[in-house]
Amino acid sequence: MPMATAPQDEYRALELLSRTPYGRVAVSMRALPFVTVARHIVVDGRVVLRLHGGFGYAQACDGSVVAYGADNLADREEGDESVWTVQFVGMARRYVPGPADLEAFGRAPVAADSTPFVPEYLCIEPQFITMHHLEGVPARRPAHSA
């Protein structure tokens, strides 16, 4: 699998990440893999994640190598037939966001699985970044109309 190792590719991958607010973080927890949704921002070449603390995922990720991925599959505008994906791995560490970070994240969700959303933050320095583009991908249309 080709790795995006050229600095311009890494810059482009982080620029694409900054265009979409959510992705998925994956880590091993009790020897089993899990994946969960996370809100992300890109800050000085690092990716900062906001997760719901009630799930315990930030604690499980802290100090571990995680994989993170995001794409524009759900965020494409009408007529946009370009799909991109960005994935990377890196060490996740708990993070205390500053005022600028909190502003960039915007309002947190109100609830997660019917419980009050309690934000926890992780910071990852991306390594082994991969980026893929697909062209000519038509927008998905519902199979059935309501």
At which residue positions do the language-model features occur?
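Short beta-strand segments
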Residues: 20-53, 68
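Short, basic/aromatic recognition patches
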Residues: 2-24
